[in-house]
Amino acid sequence: VAPDHGRPYAQRVGTDPGRLRIGLMTHSPRTDVHPDCATTTRRTGDLLEGLGHDVADTHPQALEQIDELGWAFNINWGVGAVLSLEHLGGQLGRPVTGDDVEPGTWMLAERGRGVSATDYAGAQAIMGAFRRTMATWWEDGFDLLVTPTTALPPPRIDELTPTDDDPLRGSKRSMPYAVFTSPFNTTGQPAISLPLGSSDGLPVGVQLVAAYGREDLLMAVGAQLEAEVRWSEQRAPIHA
């Protein structure tokens, strides 16, 4: 249960979070990180250090061991698609067909229908163990983790668009864009992405992750970084 901090999170904007212990991660064991994304994250670490925080190159070791998590996530994703279609069918009052949803959704559900109870139980066990292992890093005294939001700069138009031949094309290509964020979809921890850099005129995000119930730190530190970077004043070379 998230703790009651006594006032709305919005009122944490502009407050002093105190000196925080922050870990910095600029690499991924699953994919190469674009130099613009890594450099922006490193520069953010320098900014945070300049604001008085204690910043170190360290991160949860759980993030180095996420191959099993990818398998478990896909199992959960497929079964979740089946449940979603069953819920939709209840609302429609009839069975859902492939004509009712996007081909990618239908394909995910088809995969989900083939998941055994043993595999589903195994996936839940893997995700549960991952959550517990991840939590120990924060329990060891760290307040925030700083990573790139994505391992690559923003994708070009249609780069992640599904095709008739491959309805899951976008999902397959999205891994570099989700490698830093998806672990925290699994743990349920609060995180924030801030546009703290740019690549070819497009924003590059940096992710800050807090422990359970510590959205207040994200609000306070996010405001500190906004005051330093002033991203609202930045414009791409071509903009409307």
Each model region followed by its residue ranges:
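Short secondary-structure boundary segments
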Residues: 148-150, 194-197
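Structural detector of well-ordered beta-strand residues that form the stable sheet scaffold
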Residues: 145-147, 192, 209
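Short, well-ordered beta-strand elements
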Residues: 194, 202-211, 218-219
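Short beta-strand->loop structural element characteristic of the AMP-binding/adenylate-forming
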Residues: 170, 191-193
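Amidase signature
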Residues: 1-179, 186, 213, 224-240
